UniProtKB/Swiss-Prot annotation:
Record site feature (Wedge residue), residues: 278
Subunit: Forms a heterodimer with Bax1.
Family, per entry: Belongs to the helicase family. RAD25/XPB subfamily.
Residues that bind ATP: 90-97, 127
Protein name per UniProt: DNA 3'-5' translocase XPB2
Lineage: Archaea, Thermoproteota, Thermoprotei, Sulfolobales, Sulfolobaceae
Gene: xpb2
Domain Helicase ATP-binding: from-to ranges: 77-221
Length: 439
């Protein structure tokens, strides 16, 4: 017989299994708690009797399942249940939350739902109340209540992983693309939870760390793209690119800055073609004045390209042409968002906007009192944005994730074709960012 137990983010065993190492301090074989499922499976396959005190689960609450799934959502649930581990990839607006809560309802085990933002805590709480008729526990944003279904931020899960690591058999990671980052990946390894679900619209990461998914949460078990769902479950859509040029003054300034950057890179035998190259430049800039000036030149030239005055004029034309549509204008930074707000007298939402004001703006947009709003990256994740029929992206978004998140904001109503317009500055870094995102 083998005895397994949990201790502060570790599993301890009095017998060896692959993945365990002897600890003189603990007088036991040990491993990070996420190895629990594999270690237990090893002993059972060897027909070794296991006595364990690992999972000390909170009781599962009384719920009332009110979830009706679409065909693809039911397929996703079925795919995950085969191994009770893995990631479900669905576009923004395709109902990942309903899929997850159906799994919670089927599994009927204590569940910890890990989310990146306070706004997502609020969103999940509302959905759990709506679909499961249960008021969940909340950890984060000043609240600290533990229940059989609890929603927690990634940061709080990180700080309390050792304490909570054996309380929840089912672990759900919303926006799971955050998980492979250094601190959060350690957090996931401190939980013994044998059942794990990841949710995202965009699993790939620029740094390649999505390769850690199989270890931390499981492989991708189900995936549907925007294209596969458009028309039947979410709106049909078109993407239109409109090109503008820098003003003469902007072009002169832009060319000077790019020359400064190019000259520096050439003098040091460096390139700036990918993320690794950029990280090398940032590291060098920390100790080298010329590298720092080159990095500033890169940043300033990108700002000129992304926030060109020509884009403001093109936006004016678009707002006039589509004056009967509900429109969200997305900007790369808050400076451009406030500039557009001031120019066109449009309500603006950025990270500086307090929660009450933001909710008021969104509600008025939802009710039709506001027809156009402008937002910076605050809408990327965790904000329940009302339906819009037109999204205008003011450029500067090099990642596919950001682009798909913006597209998802206009795909919720399937009775009308949605349109996304991207305004791109020709012959600049803005153009190259746009091309990279489309590849």
């Amino acid at each position: 017989m083998v005895y397994l137990r949990y201790f502060k983010g570790l599993i301890l065993s009095d017998a060896y299994a692959p993945g365990l190492k002897w600890s003189d301090e603990l007088k036991a074989y040990s491993a990070l708690a996420f190895k629990y499922r594999d270690v237990r499976k090893y002993f059972l396959e060897k027909e070794i009797e296991v006595e364990e005190n690992v999972i000390d689960s909170l009781p599962f609450p009384l719920i009332k399942d009110k979830i009706e799934l679409r065909d693809y959502q039911a397929e996703a649930v079925k795919a995950w249940l085969k191994e009770k581990r893995g990631i479900i990839v669905l576009p923004t607006g395709a109902g990942k939350t309903q899929v997850a809560l159906k799994i919670v309802s089927i599994m009927k085990v204590a569940t910890l739902i890990v989310v990146p933002t306070i706004d997502l805590i609020t969103q999940w709480k509302e959905r759990i109340n709506k679909y499961l008729d249960f008021d969940p526990g909340i950890i984060g944003g000043g609240e600290d209540s533990l229940k059989g279904i609890t929603v927690i931020t990634y940061d709080s899960a990180y700080t309390r992983a050792e304490e909570l690591g054996n309380k929840f058999p089912l672990l759900i990671f919303d926006e799971v693309h955050h998980l492979p980052s250094e601190g959060y990946s350690i957090m996931a390894q401190l939980f013994a939870s044998p059942y794990r679900l990841g949710l995202t619209a965009t699993p790939e990461r620029d740094d390649g760390k999505h390769e850690l998914y199989p270890i931390l949460v499981g492989p991708i078990v189900y995936r549907k793209s925007v294209e596969e769902l458009a028309g039947k479950y979410i709106a049909k859509y078109k993407i239109k690119k409109l090109y503008v040029s820098l003003t003469n003054e902007e072009k002169k300034r832009y060319d000077g800055l790019r020359k400064k950057l190019k000259d520096f890179l050439s003098s040091r035998g460096l390139k700036l073609q990918n993320l690794d190259d950029f990280h090398r430049l940032v590291k060098l800039a920390a100790k080298d004045k010329e590298a720092r000036e080159a990095l500033l030149a890169w940043h300033e030239s990108l700002n000129i390209a992304v926030n060109s005055q020509s884009k403001i004029e093109k936006l004016r034309e678009i707002l006039q042409e589509y004056k009967n549509e509900k429109i969200i204008v997305f900007t790369r930074d808050t400076q451009m968002a406030y500039r557009i707000s001031k120019t066109f007298l449009i309500p603006v939402v950025t990270y500086k906007t307090d929660k009450d004001e933001r909710e008021e703006i969104l509600q008025k947009f939802r009710d039709g009192e506001y027809r156009v709003i402008v937002a910076s990256t605050v809408f990327d994740e965790g904000v329940d944005v009302p339906d819009a029929t037109l999204a205008i992206v003011m450029g500067g978004y090099g990642t596919k994730r950001q682009f798909l998140q913006r597209l998802g904001r206009i795909l919720r109503k399937k009775d009308k074709e949605a349109l996304l317009i991207e305004i791109v500055t020709k012959g600049t870094a803005d153009y190259r960012l746009s091309r990279r995102r489309r590849e």
